[in-house]
């Protein structure tokens, strides 16, 4: 035909067999990518420290998605929780990867078969003998099957009736594990952070899909509606499919970026809003107050803070700190976290406890300012020493650590105090290994950031694709200059197939 590159997909118009073939091949590529990517990630993933070097710090992208629906063990003998595993069973990380690759191969063979044997009687209209697809019926079949799958996932997999459940954690991402979840049928089911809503929504949406599928299988569309929405034209299917995909992409970009029960912070890392709102800082403060109420010393109180919780309260784990075009995992930026130095507490010579003002998300540099509990500035690291009134040297600031590796250690040397004050701007202070990965010290985003950016971007592109193909199918006659009264049935009941000399033409 000599088609330009942007029109090559017209070869599958009026060719149901090869339309099916290219969709099989597309699914083979998607499944093959998923399996191959999983094997690659498993080859580079280090499961040895789930607290300070979790999957999201290592830039894992598909492992978190497997984990959130119940895969936690590896044939390599490790578990995501850090336990040793003797028998991981068939549905290990590697088992899931292998199954996707096997499926990809089978789909590849099916695609070749349908490309070769494209002219099946199944695809021919009995009345006219021409290639034809009953698109409303196909829509009903797909709706019914996806409804069954959706219902089955909610009613069996998530609830644990026949399946492992899903990843469930506490609000601070400390106690996460895979467990069965009961559906939440009340108003709480609409809370995006309630796991029970995932089960109930899958069950409800599945039932709706099954009923809608049966409806579309048993009821034919009215002729006026069929013609108005161009239901006989396969480009209508393309347009509405793109609409469904871009809508879903926008939704998941939101649930990923703002956080939800479907995107646990143990698997995808914290959200930027948890840093902006001091979410983990407030929980740590609450725990310290509770310990002090039990007459524990500051050292004992801070020693009870889980290292995992302290690590969340560090700006380097904020997905908005990494630039969108800085490639690589978080570990390639600030390094592999080795240990928590402890909580730095600053005091001036008058005995006021001072708090370092934390860096906001979108700042690369920020003045080092120390305030008392009433927010009054008591000390700083001045830009111009000649005019300074609150410098660390003048105010006599000291720092003492509680909990962590430097528990009980204090420093009064101004240079050391300023060093830790600068680091306290970034939240809790950790020691990092930057040598192993040759980390460059520049923050990277977590998979949460990459997923959001990718899905929001593609959703926007697909939105325009929906408008484009929707306009093409609704106004095809206008664009093509074809007489609207043309009665020859071509291209699934619409108009002439571009470049195909065999379709009937209107006599000039």
UniProtKB/Swiss-Prot annotation:
GO terms for molecular function: chlorophyll binding; electron transporter, transferring electrons within the cyclic electron transport pathway of photosynthesis activity. One of its GO terms (cellular component) is chloroplast thylakoid membrane. Binds multiple chlorophylls. PSII binds additional chlorophylls, carotenoids and specific lipids. Keywords: Chlorophyll, Chloroplast, Chromophore, Membrane, Photosynthesis, Photosystem II, Plastid, Thylakoid, Transmembrane, Transmembrane helix. The chain crosses the membrane at residues 21-36, 101-115, 140-156, 203-218, 237-252, 457-472. The keyword Plastid applies. It is found in: Plastid, Chloroplast thylakoid membrane. InterPro entries: PS_antenna-like, PS_II_antenna-like_sf, PSII_PsbB. Disulfide bonds: none annotated. One of its GO terms (biological process) is photosynthetic electron transport in photosystem II. Coiled coil: none annotated. It is a multi-pass membrane protein. Belongs to the PsbB/PsbC family. PsbB subfamily. One of the components of the core complex of photosystem II (PSII). It binds chlorophyll and helps catalyze the primary light-induced photochemical processes of PSII. PSII is a light-driven water:plastoquinone oxidoreductase, using light energy to abstract electrons from H(2)O, generating O(2) and a proton gradient subsequently used for ATP formation. PSII is composed of 1 copy each of membrane proteins PsbA, PsbB, PsbC, PsbD, PsbE, PsbF, PsbH, PsbI, PsbJ, PsbK, PsbL, PsbM, PsbT, PsbX, PsbY, PsbZ, Psb30/Ycf12, at least 3 peripheral proteins of the oxygen-evolving complex and a large number of cofactors. It forms dimeric complexes. NCBIfam families: PS_II_CP47. This is Photosystem II CP47 reaction center protein. It comes from Angiopteris evecta. The gene is psbB.
């Amino acid at each position: 035909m000599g088609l330009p590159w942007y029109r090559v997909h017209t070869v599958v118009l009026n060719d149901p067999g090869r339309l099916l073939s290219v969709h099989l091949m597309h699914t083979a590529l998607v499944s093959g990518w998923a399996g191959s990517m999983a094997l690659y990630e498993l080859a580079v993933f280090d499961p040895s420290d789930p607290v300070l070097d979790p999957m999201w710090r290592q830039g894992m992208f598909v492992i978190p998605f497997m984990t959130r629906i119940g895969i936690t063990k590896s044939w390599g003998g490790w578990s995501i929780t850090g336990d040793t595993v003797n028998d991981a069973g068939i549905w290990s990380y590697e088992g899931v990867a292998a199954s996707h690759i096997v499926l990809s191969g089978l789909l590849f063979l099916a695609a070749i078969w349908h490309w070769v044997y494209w002219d099946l009687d199944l695809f021919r209209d009995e009345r006219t003998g021409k290639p034809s697809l009953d698109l409303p019926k196909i829509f009903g079949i797909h709706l019914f099957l996806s409804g069954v799958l959706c219902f089955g996932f909610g009613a069996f997999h998530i609830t644990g009736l026949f399946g492992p459940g899903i990843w469930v954690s506490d609000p601070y991402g400390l106690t996460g594990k895979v467990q069965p979840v009961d559906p939440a049928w009340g108003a709480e089911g609409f809370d995006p952070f309630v796991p029970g809503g995932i089960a109930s929504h899958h069950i409800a949406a599945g039932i709706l899909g099954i009923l809608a599928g049966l409806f579309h299988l048993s009821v034919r569309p009215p002729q006026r509606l069929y013609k108005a929405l161009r239901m006989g034209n396969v480009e209508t299917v393309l347009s509405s499919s793109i609409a469904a995909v871009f809508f879903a992409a926008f939704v998941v970009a939101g649930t990923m970026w703002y956080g939800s029960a479907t995107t646990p912070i143990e698997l995808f890392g914290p959200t930027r809003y948890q840093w902006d709102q001091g979410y983990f800082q407030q929980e740590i403060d609450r725990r310290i107050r509770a310990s002090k109420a039990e007459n524990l010393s500051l050292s004992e109180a801070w020693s009870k803070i889980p290292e995992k919780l302290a690590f969340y309260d560090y700006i380097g784990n904020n997905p908005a700190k990494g630039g969108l075009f800085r490639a690589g995992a978080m570990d390639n930026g600030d390094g592999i976290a080795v240990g928590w130095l402890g909580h730095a507490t600053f005091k001036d010579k008058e005995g006021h406890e001072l708090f370092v003002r934390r860096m906001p998300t979108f700042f690369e540099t920020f003045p080092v300012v120390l305030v008392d509990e009433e927010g009054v500035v008591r000390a700083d690291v001045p830009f111009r020493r000649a005019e300074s009134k609150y410098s660390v040297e003048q105010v006599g600031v000291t720092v003492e650590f509680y909990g962590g590796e430097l528990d009980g250690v204090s420093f009064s040397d101004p240079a050391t105090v300023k060093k830790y004050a600068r680091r306290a701007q970034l939240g809790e202070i950790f020691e990092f290994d930057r040598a192993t990965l040759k980390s460059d010290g520049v923050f990277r985003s977590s998979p949460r950031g990459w997923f959001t950016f990718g899905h929001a971007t593609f959703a926007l592109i697909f939105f325009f694709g929906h408008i484009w193909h929707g306009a093409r199918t609704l106004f095809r006659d206008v664009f093509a200059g074809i007489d609207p009264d043309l009665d020859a049935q071509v291209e699934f009941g619409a108009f002439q197939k571009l470049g195909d000399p065999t379709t009937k033409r209107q006599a000039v």
